[in-house]
């Protein structure tokens, strides 16, 4: 009997096995101490997740599998315990498992919690991001007037130094050049593809940030009483700034945040977790609150009004992504991703999937 108890972990018909084996097996969430779950998280059933039965969770499993290729580490976040997430990586179902099997696996291994904000509300803001393709140059030209830099190789400090000073003093290693507006967009998105004059493509991924606050470009235009044709959508703002280069330099340099990049031999988009991002299955979240690698179920709407109910994985972060119910959905690369991502701004609910912990007790 004892050996059977040891090998039983968790399957959909666990209760039947427990009865047969005579085991006393108690189930606990988080790390066995529910008092460590913040009070703004409330346990719910999977039936409470809108559209849960309709989502093809196999794609979310693949995103989680990518997460498992990196070591999930605790870096000061509130929840959950990184070791518990990493343990689930040793229990993944087959990559060929059908939807029902994968759904049952998530239901057996994770407990959903609905997230509430500080005021007790259960909705938050969802935006989108993508990996742009921009024109670039190996040397400075009239068209390519702004450097794209990697972190300083001489160990020079860049933390707490504003963008304007970093660029003017060249605190970093110049990788390539591009239009200043495109470089700002690249920094906001966190990664992108550079198309050089000879047609070759270079992949640039996030390397580091100067830890300065982000100041909205569109917000600055509003403060100045400047309204681009088409309003304050990202597309309208970027177009207006390209038509007004002096203004562009003023407002872009007035945003002190600066992002460094590195050239990647792979064309995959790499998030802060260090693993490739998956289109509409990877999400950027506040890693001061959530351990990267956490499965999260999002219920919101896309910019065209369609319902968006998806199981995703927190694999990235963003300078403006702060708070309990705040996330940035990764929509992929290229023009189509751009159209969806730049129009995305909706309210919705968030459910996080906390790893279950099973405590085994010898049979009496």
Predicted features along the sequence, with ranges:
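Bacterial N-terminal signal peptides that target proteins for export
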Residues: 2-11
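Sec-dependent N-terminal signal peptides
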Residues: 13-16
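Solvent-exposed, well-ordered loop and adjacent helix/strand elements within mature globular domains
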Residues: 23-364
């Amino acid at each position: 009997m004892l050996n059977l108890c040891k090998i039983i972990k968790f399957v959909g018909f666990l209760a039947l096995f427990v009865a047969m084996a005579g085991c006393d097996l108690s189930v606990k969430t988080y790390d066995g101490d529910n008092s460590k779950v913040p009070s703004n998280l409330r346990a719910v059933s999977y039936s409470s997740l809108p559209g849960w039965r309709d989502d093809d969770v196999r794609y979310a499993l693949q995103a989680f599998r990518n997460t498992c290729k990196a070591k999930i580490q605790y870096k000061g976040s509130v929840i959950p315990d990184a070791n518990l997430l990493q343990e689930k990586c040793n229990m993944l179902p087959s990559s060929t498992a059908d939807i029902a099997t994968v759904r049952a696996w998530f239901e057996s291994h994770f407990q959903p919690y609905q997230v509430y904000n500080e005021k007790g509300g259960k909705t938050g803001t969802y935006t989108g991001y993508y990996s742009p393709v921009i024109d670039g140059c190996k040397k400075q030209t009239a068209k390519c007037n702004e450097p794209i830099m990697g972190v300083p190789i001489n160990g020079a400090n860049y933390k707490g130094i504003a963008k304007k000073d970093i660029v003017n003093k060249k605190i970093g290693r110049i990788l390539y050049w591009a239009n200043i507006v495109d470089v700002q967009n690249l920094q906001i998105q966190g990664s992108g593809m550079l198309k050089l004059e000879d047609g070759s493509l270079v992949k640039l991924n996030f390397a580091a940030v100067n830890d300065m606050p982000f100041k909205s470009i569109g917000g600055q235009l509003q403060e100045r009483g400047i309204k681009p044709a088409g309003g304050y959508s990202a597309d309208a703002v970027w177009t207006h700034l390209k038509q007004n280069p002096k203004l562009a330099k003023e407002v872009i340099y007035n945003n002190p945040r600066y992002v460094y990049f590195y050239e990647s031999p792979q064309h995959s988009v790499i998030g802060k977790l260090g693993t490739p991002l998956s289109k509409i299955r990877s999400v950027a979240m506040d890693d001061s609150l959530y351990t990267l690698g956490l499965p999260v179920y999002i219920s919101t709407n896309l910019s065209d009004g369609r319902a968006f109910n998806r199981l995703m994985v927190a694999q990235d972060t963003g300078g403006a992504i702060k708070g309990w119910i705040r996330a940035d959905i990764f929509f992929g690369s290229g023009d189509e991703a751009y159209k969806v991502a730049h129009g995305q701004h909706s309210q919705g609910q968030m459910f996080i999937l906390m790893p279950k912990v099973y405590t085994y007790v010898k049979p009496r």
